[in-house]
């Protein structure tokens, strides 16, 4: 069994955003400002509630982040869709980290609940992705549940996050 890297720094994550980590045509993260985490603190193909693998990541919050001035003027909060996108980003990263081929695309989620906010006063956002299943067929499909914490309190939950890896068809 191959031992895979179990954590990633910001600089290493950026190599994934540039398409250098998993090879051309394979899973790729967005680059800043759409990259919604600074580091992956732990990633494993086993463990988690379903023993199918998990990812843990962190995002340092500072008052000068790009979304605060425009969402909303005078009442700054991080858009909820960015936290959800981070969960999809991490789900796709996991599939690439497993060595699965193809370009990642968010497909759907079951249920999403927002019970709190990220404001300029927040210091740290943490993400957890707990895999339920990885299906390998015409495409690779990852299905996971996710959560997001702001300064230690769970404020977002998402069930059945789905990300697919798609390979380009040969002409």
From Swiss-Prot:
GO terms for cellular component: cytoplasm. Keywords: Cytoplasm, Fatty acid biosynthesis, Fatty acid metabolism, Isomerase, Lipid biosynthesis, Lipid metabolism, Lyase. The active site is at 71. It is found in: Cytoplasm. GO terms for biological process: unsaturated fatty acid biosynthetic process. Gene3D superfamilies: Hotdog Thioesterase (3.10.129.10). It catalyses: a (3R)-hydroxyacyl-[ACP] = a (2E)-enoyl-[ACP] + H2O; (3R)-hydroxydecanoyl-[ACP] = (2E)-decenoyl-[ACP] + H2O; (2E)-decenoyl-[ACP] = (3Z)-decenoyl-[ACP]. Pathway: Lipid metabolism; fatty acid biosynthesis. GO terms for molecular function: (3R)-hydroxyacyl-[acyl-carrier-protein] dehydratase activity; trans-2-decenoyl-acyl-carrier-protein isomerase activity. Its main location: cytoplasm. Its EC number is 4.2.1.59, 5.3.3.14. It comes from the Bacteria. It holds the Pfam family FabA. Necessary for the introduction of cis unsaturation into fatty acids. Catalyzes the dehydration of (3R)-3-hydroxydecanoyl-ACP to E-(2)-decenoyl-ACP and then its isomerization to Z-(3)-decenoyl-ACP. Can catalyze the dehydratase reaction for beta-hydroxyacyl-ACPs with saturated chain lengths up to 16:0, being most active on intermediate chain length. Homodimer. Belongs to the thioester dehydratase family. FabA subfamily. This is 3-hydroxydecanoyl-[acyl-carrier-protein] dehydratase. It comes from Sinorhizobium fredii (strain NBRC 101917 / NGR234). The gene is fabA.
């Amino acid at each position: 069994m191959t031992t895979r890297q179990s954590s990633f720094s910001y600089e290493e994550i950026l190599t994934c955003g540039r398409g250098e980590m998993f090879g051309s045509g394979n899973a790729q993260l967005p680059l800043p400002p759409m990259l919604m985490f600074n580091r992956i603190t732990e990633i494993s193909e086993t463990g988690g509630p379903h023993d199918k693998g998990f990812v843990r990541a962190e995002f340092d919050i500072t008052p000068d982040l790009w979304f605060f001035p425009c969402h909303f003027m005078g009442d700054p909060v991080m858009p909820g869709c960015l936290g959800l996108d981070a969960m999809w980003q991490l789900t796709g990263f996991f599939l690439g980290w497993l060595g699965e081929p193809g370009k990642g695309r968010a497909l759907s989620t079951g249920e999403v609940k927002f019970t709190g906010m990220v404001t300029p006063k927040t210091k740290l956002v943490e993400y957890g992705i707990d895999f339920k299943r990885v299906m390998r067929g015409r495409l690779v499909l990852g299905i996971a549940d996710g959560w997001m914490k702001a300064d230690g309190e769970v404020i977002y939950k998402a069930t059945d996050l789905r990300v697919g890896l798609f390979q380009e068809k040969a002409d």
